[in-house]
């Protein structure tokens, strides 16, 4: 995926435009201790998540948007509909979409969007196993790889996808 995404950025007239839609989850989790296991999901803003990965600016033009800040166990039809509406309305403005999401219901969100989106651009869901404040947090690398995946036009041929764990 990294090679494909780098190729997109290198050969395009400009960097691909990717909208990062944040819903919360562990990837946006915050805890009192970097080594502790207790944390609250969905506490870190999308602006902070994007700022934590400055390398994103080398591969895409990022537009962050906070949709909700919840743990994915609290995902609802209303949030799914809001994601659907946002992507369909923003489809002409962006080359792809990344949705940061908790892992509890990530596959349900991907399935719903795959069935209902009219937009035929890449849509990539991404999450993490460790909160953003955790030692060795996997969210930054996962977010980077998700943006690479969303920047690749051929990703759209696969429907809505999930990119995690390198």
Give the ranges of each region predicted by the language model:
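Hydrophobic h-region of N-terminal signal peptides that target proteins for export
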Residues: 2-12
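Active-site histidine-anchored catalytic micro-motif
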Residues: 10-166
């Amino acid at each position: 995926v990294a090679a494909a995404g780098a190729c997109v950025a290198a050969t395009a007239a400009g960097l691909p435009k990717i909208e990062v839609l944040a819903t919360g989850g562990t990837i946006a989790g915050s805890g009192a201790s970097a080594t502790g296991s207790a944390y609250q999901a969905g506490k870190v803003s999308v602006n902070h998540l994007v700022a934590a990965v400055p390398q994103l600016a080398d591969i895409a033009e990022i537009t962050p948007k906070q949709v909700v800040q919840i743990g994915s166990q609290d995902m609802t039809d209303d949030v799914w509909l809001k994601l659907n509406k946002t992507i369909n309305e923003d489809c002409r403005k962006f080359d792809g979409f990344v949705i940061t999401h908790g892992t509890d219901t990530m596959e349900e969100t991907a399935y719903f969007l795959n069935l209902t989106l009219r937009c035929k651009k890449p849509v990539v869901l991404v999450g993490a196993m460790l909160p953003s404040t955790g030692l060795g947090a996997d969210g930054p690398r996962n977010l980077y790889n998700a943006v690479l995946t969303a920047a690749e036009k051929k990703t759209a041929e696969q429907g809505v996808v999930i990119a995690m764990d390198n």
